[in-house]
Every structure is written in C-alpha cells, then in structure tokens.
Amino acid sequence: MYRYKITIEYLGTHFSGWQRQAGVLSVQQILEEAIYKFSGEQVTLFGSGRTDAGVHAIGQIAHFDLSKYLEPYKIIKAINYFVRPYAVGVWNCELVSNNFHARFSATSRHYIYRIVNRTYPSVIDLNRVWWISAPLDVLAMQQAATYLLGKHDFTSFRSSSCQSKSPIKTLTEINIIKEYEEIKLYLSAPSFLHYMVRNIVGSLVLVGKNIWQVEQIKNVLDAKDRKVAGPTAPAFGLYFIKAEY
C-alpha cells in the first residue's frame, strides 16, 4: 500500500465539519468521493484536526492509502478537478511512510481566530470573520491571555459534548495581534479540547469589552466549570492553520 499525505484548504461555511456524518455534507466525504472517482478505490481519509461546522482550514493535513502508485502532482490535479464546485482544494501531496498518521503523528496544531473590530460589518469577509462593533481593548486581552499559557485543566473552556479523556492540555502559544481593523488570535497546542479555542476567544472578548477584568480569566480557569466562562465564539471566525510533525 502507498500512503499519501495531502494538505487541504477549505471554507467551512456550507459543511457540517471535517468528519463524515450520515445525511450531511462533510469535507471528508467530498474528498473521499473525489479520490474514488480517479482511483477506483474506496479510501478512508484521516485528518489532523476534526474541524466543526463552519470552521475553515488553510493547512489541514490528511492521509489515505492506495494500492497502486500515482504521482503526487497527478493526485493534486485529480482531486481538485473532482471536488468542484465545492470550496475545497488540495495544494500539496507527498508519499509518506506507512507509519505516518495525520492525527496521531502530529506534535502541534495551530489555529487563528479572526475578528473585525469596527462599527460596520465586513461584506467581503462575510462568514469568514467575527464582526464586533464595540471597541476591544487588545492590550487587556493580551494580558488576560497569559494566564492560559502552559499546562492547565481547561474544563472551563471545553464543550459539554467533549469526548476527550482528560481536560489537561498545554497551550504553547496564544498571541493576539491587531492589524488595522482586524484582531487575530493565534493559538497553538499539541491538541485541543472540543470548542476550546472558540470558548477561549469568547471569554477574552469579554475582557476586551471591559465587561471582565483581566484577572477574571484566571478565575474562570481555576473554577473548572464551563458555566462561568464566556460565550462560544462563532465558528466562522476560526481557521485551522497547520499541523506539525
């Protein structure tokens, strides 16, 4: 068997998420069907991150196996042909060891959350950013974010449906940058809990609006109770950037 690693970008707006589910449209399904159309093989695609409905990706990594060898550049062209007209594209493909696993071999995952902070909405980036009209104090958000760096129990920031065995995660990066009218939050960790990034963003926005004091983020973290954290930020502002191996 030949194992291929592909790098994918997609707009999550019209998808139920990455993972295949009965009765709804997923990114995994679209790609698996495209691979079947040119290879004649039923494959299972394994992704590095299982993004939720509405979440986008710039560098999602996935792997699949084929019984026959195909040139990687031909796979890119074939997949991109057959995924039309969906907002999905493959921009890299390489042959890898059969020991490689897109999910379990990953050592780090990186996300970005985009906020447009101005009095009027972004038409060009509709469903691609979270528009917040109230001015945000980015410095306060940055100060609050430092409480989340490192290894912690992130129970307060996980969803009620999270299936992870442990709430203990290690946040290796949380960086907040303002570029003109856009605020970008970069978060990195070996792995994340379900809704963890979006719940963190929702809580930091409360700090940015001066509804919460900076220290409240530490209180929320220490409480280990989802009910005391802020609202879940909308899915459409979140992007899976890349996975590292």
From Swiss-Prot:
The keyword Glycosyltransferase does not apply. The active site is at residue 52. It comes from the Bacteria. Keywords: Isomerase, tRNA processing. GO terms for molecular function: RNA binding; tRNA pseudouridine(38-40) synthase activity. InterPro entries: PsdUridine_synth_cat_dom_sf (IPR020103), PsdUridine_synth_TruA (IPR001406), PsdUridine_synth_TruA_a/b_dom (IPR020097), PsdUridine_synth_TruA_C (IPR020095), TruA/RsuA/RluB/E/F_N (IPR020094). Gene3D superfamilies: Pseudouridine synthase I, catalytic domain, C-terminal subdomain, Pseudouridine synthase I, catalytic domain, N-terminal subdomain. It catalyses: uridine(38/39/40) in tRNA = pseudouridine(38/39/40) in tRNA. The keyword ATP-binding does not apply. SUPFAM superfamilies: Pseudouridine synthase (SSF55120). Its EC number is 5.4.99.12. Pfam families: PseudoU_synth_1. One of its GO terms (biological process) is tRNA pseudouridine synthesis. Substrate binds at residue 111. Formation of pseudouridine at positions 38, 39 and 40 in the anticodon stem and loop of transfer RNAs. Belongs to the tRNA pseudouridine synthase TruA family. Homodimer. This is tRNA pseudouridine synthase A. It comes from Rickettsia typhi (strain ATCC VR-144 / Wilmington). The gene is truA.
